[in-house]
Amino acid sequence: MGVGLCGRGIVAKPRLYEVASDLGTDSKTLMGILREMGEFVKSPSSALEPPVVRKLAKAFAEKYPDKVEEKKEHTPPAPVVETPKAPPPLPRPIIRHAVRGVPSGAPRPGNNPYAPRQGMGQLATPGPATKRPVKFKAEGDKKPASTHRRVPAPLPQKRTPLRGRGAPGAFGRGNKPKSRKSKTLKRQEFEMRDAPVIGGVTIPRGDGRVIRLMQGASVTDFAEKIDVLPANLLSVLFHLGEMATATESLDEATFEILAEEIGYKVQIVSPDDEDRALLESFSVNLAAEHAEDSELDLAIRPPVVTIMGHVDHGKTLLLDTIRNTNTLAEESGGITQHIGAYQVSVGDRFVTFIDTPGHEAFTAMRARGAKVTDIAVLVVAADDGIMPQTIEALDHARSADVPIVVAVNKIDKEGANPAKIRQQMTEFDVIPEEYGGDVMFIDISAKTGQGVDALLEAILLTADAALELRANPDRTARGVTIEAKLDAGRGAVATVLVQSGTLRVGDRVVTGCAYGRVRAMVDENGLPVESAPPSRPVRVQGLSSVPKAGDSFIVVAEDRQARQIAEKREANERNAQLAKSRKRVSLEDFTRAIQEGRVQSLNMIIKGDVSGAVEALEESLSKLDVGEEVSLRIIHRGVGAITESDVNLATVDNAVVIGFNVRPDRKARDRAAREGVDVRFYSVIYDAIEDIEKSLKGLLKPELEERKLGLAIVKEVFHSSRVGTIAGCSVESGSITRNAKARLIRDGVVVVNDLTVTSLRRFKDDVTEVKSGFECGVGLGSCDDIRIGDEIETIQIVEKPRA
């Protein structure tokens, strides 16, 4: 029995009914044992892995030892009994002599068509002619089965050293030589023998090996890394309660659960490393290019200064004072909602300024501004002091490892206290120079212009003292996209900051998922420029789509190369987005949620004028916390006007369209009115966040509140064949109303709940309500267990809106 199982398991995967036949039982019994072991099979025809077969045989022997013994007792002994009866007629010396005495001219054994046993291992004796046929044929005709069973005898098999004509059965008729297994096959068999069995499949254990995967990788990608079939990994995921397909993008948490189950460790490659590997596959190595620059190639470049701080502390007004413009009046709500990049002249030198939003929703924008800057100017209002976004901007500047200059603004206002600002900043390890530190504090008034020249001088002094600002202007351009938008007449327009090299009109560029040839470049004043050296911000036209703020841009040699890089980035970003939006749902939770209808979601489409504002709005909405019952799904986001395709998508997915500083075209407006799509427009970001939060709370199921209506004491109990048990009551408080919900209370304990006042009478009249101080007869439907002294409490369930 055991040999049959092991032998069959190694050669192929046996069916369940075959294993049941070997064990002498039925398939139903084995299916029950497999269910207890945690292995689930669909039918008796299901194939089993060898380790599962071994565990099943062991479990069956432990559970049904009597059947195993009975199987052993009824095993037929025929092969064991008949085998020793064959040897007596053919003594061993004669066989040995026959092998040696075959003449060279004799016909080859096995080729005689009249021989009764061609290919057998026994030979005729080489005695006289009269003896040989009689003796050989008599034995051969008598017991052919016995002589056939003597074939595996050890002596004839060992005495066959001659290859050509020694042993019968040559030319493929006898015993074939055993092929030696390769080391790889032996190692695989050994690994599979010790491999764990999960969900009915066998997967080699990883023993802690680290597997690197890209964001948004699929089960197929993981399977290729560890050299197993994707179907096996899907079986393991299903065993763990996860539903997925072979090509579906999974999140990091799902990969960690899967890898831990089979003995691996998963490391998700960061987006920067992933993009670096992508560029290197196209022979673009940014680090190597910077290393190749010699000292003679480097030239001095202007410093890049980012103005940061809390909202309404005067950052944009300060920049307007420096530039002699009025940017603040153009921003909705009086707050900056875009990143602005400008270059101004200070004497005979240039300084590039980047203005970042101060509102809390624009954290990502401030982080990007800190990464591309050389110096951070931290604006703090002298009357407000340090605020939350002030601390956040300080953290961004420190994480970017850039020097800081503190501008204490609004010193012209009443109640301004610059000394207090300096003392508060020391609590965050920002020590002014007058206190013995290394940070310059400049008192300014952006409104009157007081101290602005001193601030510019402090910026240049910091740049000369702490930084070595040089770049190679003679190579292909590299930089970063500061902001991007979709212009009605110009198409996709991106504000880029050149960090090295020189960007020229006609260059082939790729930034994020957008690519194209630079058709035109203009500066911050709208004047056309032909080239942009390092630290120069320009607006670029000619891109295929709107890139995201913060995307790096590079110049490549061919249009085809730019398109391939952009398409590959778009595919990676799509996979990462799918993995991010995928919610891990167990089988039980998924089924239960559908049955109970607990899943509610608000689908949204966000369109904005610039990509940075769309990103900030999306990030702020994702942080809204309104409980687990309601989810927010952003099914599409983009830059530009609201189009008819956006309305069509909202119609299909029952979504709300949010327009941030954009409007729908005529077709989209008509389609939205016809389909009843909710389209909302905002120009200030926190207005949008507040309205959407209220909408999400409106999706929440109202809280149910129980209100007490009245209490009655049972004085008498009457029984009626028509209406059942009737309680004669005295109303103690409130009122008793017909059809009201009620509960029966006895000695302070609720005896019966969820009752209804089915009948209510006062004397012989049916009434709808009996107030406190009066007596009445109360019927509680089929409830008959009513005793004198019980209390009947009526209640009302009301819906209470969520706070």
From Swiss-Prot:
A single Gene Ontology CC term: cytosol
Residues involved in GTP binding: 309-316, 355-359, 409-412
Alphabetized UniProt keyword annotations: Cytoplasm, GTP-binding, Initiation factor, Nucleotide-binding, Protein biosynthesis
Annotated localization: Cytoplasm
Homology family: Belongs to the TRAFAC class translation factor GTPase superfamily. Classic translation factor GTPase family. IF-2 subfamily.
HAMAP family tied to this protein: IF_2_B
Name by which UniProt lists this protein: Translation initiation factor IF-2
Designated gene of the protein: infB
